[in-house]
């Protein structure tokens, strides 16, 4: 950088000799040049940004005492850039107010607090862990795919008040869309006083097949102490076993149960409470959350007992001759006679054709027709007889033994190439387009 004291004359000579586009930038009352903060990139009007450094400096020092300070004191020594013909740009002053960390407000802030630092993880965690507002609900699309199943119809917990699925004790499993079924392993076991069935049915699982017995983590209970003084519905409607609808809720299930007081009449404690023992064998333990295909497979897997065959006297059934109407019988006889006549005419035609000698067709037979194929392959009766006669003749008269080969005589003239003649079975030879 250049000092203003030593280079003031150089600047005056430069602007008077070389710079013809702009006037010298030195003030008339001060020979010091203005300050340039860059190398001269001017993107806007020069009249807006090009201000004299001394005038700007005087305005910044004091507006009221500008004249006295200028005349009494010399201007401060500032560095300046070399002259250039591009417009000069002065950096605009920073008008943002600085935040002072010292003052009465600083005492209220916690120690080490910084406004520009990111929030701590602890604050973010508390913001997300706060309970959601009451207006937030599960989206409709997700609510449709989530299904909370009621207890299995073969292991139901009855109570005097209507059961609610919000109670974990009453929920056997939750089916969420295509992601699968989540089972509740803390389901009320067979030791519960509210349970109708004292133990789970044999081979019962939540998927309806004996292979998944590890889903339930309570063992079978063989002894049953009784239901106590609990008033519970006793008879299950038969329509409950037929219905395989997975969407049946508790209230639909409760409506299908018929109330009865004959609870002491049931002695079978390993299966569902049904009135007949034979129907108990046919019933299959299923779950409300199992798919219909699994329920069908489980039904097939259960082997039904085969009853012992009993000797039953069956009277022989004598088939009665069916009566045919006269009109139908007449039509059948007529059609049979017609078929016999056609068969006889065909056989007669074949006999005549076999006895008749072969005659060369007078007209040319269409190429690749049936008649042409029979003649060209020699399958007519006359051709077959001729072939058999020739065969028997050659067998009776065998040709003489061939003599020893002799050296061929060389022909004196040019060699002749034999031509292949056309051989046909018809009188009229085929004529080629060359002829």
From Swiss-Prot:
Strongly expressed in the cytoplasm of the pharynx muscle cells and several head neurons, probably the IL1s or IL2s, throughout development. Also expressed in some other unidentified neurons in the tail region. Weakly expressed in the nuclei of the T-cells and the T-cell daughters. Not expressed in gonads and in P12 cell. Residues 65-146, 393-419 are annotated as: Disordered. GO terms for cellular component: cytoplasm; nucleus. Keywords: Coiled coil, Cytoplasm, Nucleus, Wnt signaling pathway. May act synergistically with the Wnt pathways to control T-cell fate specification, gonad development, and P12 cell fate specification. Required for the distribution of pop-1 and tlp-1 proteins. It is found in: Nucleus; Cytoplasm. It comes from the Eukaryota. It comes from Caenorhabditis elegans. The gene is tcl-2. Residues 322-352 form a coiled coil. The keyword Transmembrane does not apply. GO terms for biological process: asymmetric cell division; Wnt signaling pathway. This is T-cell defective protein 2.
């Amino acid at each position: 950088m250049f000092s203003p004291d030593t280079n003031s004359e150089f600047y005056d000579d430069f602007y008077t000799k070389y710079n013809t586009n702009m006037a010298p930038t030195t003030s008339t009352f001060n020979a010091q040049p203005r300050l340039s903060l860059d190398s001269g990139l001017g993107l806007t009007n020069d009249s807006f940004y090009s201000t004299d450094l001394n005038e700007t400096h005087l305005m910044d020092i004091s507006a009221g005492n500008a004249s006295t300070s200028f005349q009494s004191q010399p201007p401060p020594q500032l560095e300046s850039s070399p002259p250039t013909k591009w417009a000069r740009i002065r950096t605009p002053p920073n008008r943002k107010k600085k935040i002072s960390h010292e003052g009465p407000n600083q005492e209220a802030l916690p120690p080490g607090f910084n406004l520009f630092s990111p929030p701590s993880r602890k604050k973010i965690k508390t913001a997300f862990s706060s309970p959601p507002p009451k207006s937030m609900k599960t989206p409709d699309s997700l609510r449709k795919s989530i299904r909370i199943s009621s207890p299995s119809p073969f292991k139901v917990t009855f109570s005097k008040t209507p059961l609610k699925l919000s109670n974990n004790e009453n929920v056997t499993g939750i089916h969420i869309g295509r992601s699968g079924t989540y089972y509740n392993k803390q389901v009320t076991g067979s030791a519960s006083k509210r349970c109708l069935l004292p133990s789970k049915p044999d081979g019962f699982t939540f998927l309806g097949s004996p292979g998944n017995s590890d889903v339930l983590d309570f063992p079978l209970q063989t002894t049953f102490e009784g239901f106590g003084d609990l008033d519970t519905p006793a008879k299950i409607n038969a329509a409950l076993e037929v219905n395989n609808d997975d969407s049946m809720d508790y209230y639909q299930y409760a409506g299908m149960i018929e109330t009865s007081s004959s609870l002491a009449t049931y002695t079978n404690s390993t299966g569902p409470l049904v009135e007949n023992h034979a129907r108990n064998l046919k019933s299959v333990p299923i779950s409300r959350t199992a798919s219909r295909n699994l329920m069908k497979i489980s039904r097939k897997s259960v082997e039904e007992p085969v009853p012992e065959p009993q000797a039953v006297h069956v009277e022989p059934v004598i088939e009665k001759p069916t009566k045919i109407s006269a009109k139908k019988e007449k039509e059948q006889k007529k059609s049979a006679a017609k078929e016999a006549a056609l068969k006889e005419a065909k056989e007669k035609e074949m006999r005549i054709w076999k006895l008749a000698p072969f005659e060369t067709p007078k007209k040319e037979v269409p190429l690749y027709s049936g008649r042409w194929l029979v003649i060209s392959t020699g399958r007519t009766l006359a051709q077959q007889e001729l072939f058999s006669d020739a065969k028997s003749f050659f067998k009776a008269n065998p040709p003489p033994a061939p003599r020893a080969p002799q050296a061929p005589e060389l022909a004196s003239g040019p060699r002749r190439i034999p031509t292949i003649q056309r051989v046909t079975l018809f009188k009229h030879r085929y004529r080629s387009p060359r002829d």
